[in-house]
A protein has these predicted regions:
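Conserved catalytic/acceptor-binding region of the Class I
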Residues: 119-120, 126, 130-201, 217-220
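Class I SAM-dependent methyltransferase SAM/SAH-binding core
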Residues: 40-96, 120
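A short acidic, Gly/Pro-enriched loop at the edge of an enzyme's catalytic core
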Residues: 94-106
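A short SAM/SAH-binding and catalytic strip from SAM-dependent methyltransferases
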Residues: 104-118, 141
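Conserved Class I S-adenosyl-L-methionine
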Residues: 3-8, 48-50, 169-260
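Conserved alpha-helix/loop element of class I SAM-dependent methyltransferases that forms part
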Residues: 20-39, 54, 58
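Short, well-ordered alpha-helices that flank and scaffold nucleotide-derived cofactor binding pockets
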Residues: 31, 53, 57, 79, ...
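Class I SAM-dependent methyltransferase Rossmann-like catalytic core
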Residues: 8-20
Length: 260
């Protein structure tokens, strides 16, 4: 089976599948950053604006810029009621359209492993942040089973079914993140693992939500019904429902921050 590149073209589907997870992690991440109010922020790879909205709600920023290569995601983000002060535009994480030392804080939420050259992406965040400002990111721990789609991808691997990975997937490793930050010349670098839980009303919700993932959707669409049924049964066995029929599981992200 040929693998299609992971594409983010549906802001609504992404909100249902990943937006909830993103905000669960994002809340803990922002508390860890402990930023001052009234700052200038840039959220690189803002996607559909889920994390940008959290910056607006929790950090009382003076300015927020959101950059993403997907026009569809930018359109969705621009219509978020909770992020109306933010300015969203399409752009390249490796060539940010801003002047040196302009921002107080730069973030990448679940993005760095999608940047073709992560080192250049970190260098660009550092370039546009003032001395003393913060450069921070978090990424699902792909190799440690921390990705929200892990219930299904684990069974795909067990069945020898291939699925696409982010182009710079090694950047999800904590040791790689640390090296990227240190090699960029950032100071006072700190790391932590952020673990969150999500509860699904039933198995059908768990499956249909994860099936919206741009990683899984094109793969599942090409599988015969018999294989889909076998995968579903395997996931049910791995994640049994509670007495109410609900299923709860955790995901975790590797987080890092440093000062310019």
């Amino acid at each position: 089976m040929s693998l299609e590149p992971i594409k983010f073209e549906d802001g609504v589907a992404y909100e249902r599948m990943m937006g909830v997870w993103s905000q669960l992690v994002g809340s803990k991440f922002l508390n860890w950053m402990s930023p001052r109010k009234g700052q200038r922020w840039i959220n690189v790879g803002c996607g559909n604006g889920a994390f940008t909205e959290q910056i607006v709600r929790h950090c009382s920023p003076n300015e927020v810029q959101g950059i993403d290569p997907s026009e569809a995601q930018i359109v969705f983000a621009s219509n978020r009621e909770g992020a109306q002060i933010a300015v969203f535009q399409t752009g390249d994480a490796m060539a940010l359209p801003f002047a040196i030392d302009y921002f107080d804080a730069a973030t990448m939420a679940l993005v760095i492993f999608f940047v073709p050259d992560p080192a250049l992406g970190v260098a660009e965040m550092k370039r546009v942040v003032r001395p003393g400002g913060s450069v921070a990111a978090y990424a699902w721990d792909v190799f440690g089973g921390g990705v929200p789609t892990a219930p299904i991808t684990a069974e795909l691997r067990a069945s020898n079914i291939s699925y696409p990975l982010p182009p710079s997937v090694n950047a999800s490793r904590m040791e790689v993140l640390y090296s990227l930050w240190v090699d960029a010349g950032l100071q006072s670098v700190e790391t932590r693992v952020i673990t969150v839980e999500r509860t699904f009303a039933n198995f059908e919700e768990l499956w249909s939500t994860n099936a919206l993932s741009p990683t899984l959707k094109p793969v599942l669409a090409k599988l015969p019904e018999k294989t889909i049924s076998q995968l579903q049964n395997a996931v049910r066995e791995r994640f049994p429902a509670d007495a109410k029929g609900q299923i709860t599981y955790s995901s975790h992200a590797n987080a890092i921050k440093g000062l310019v």
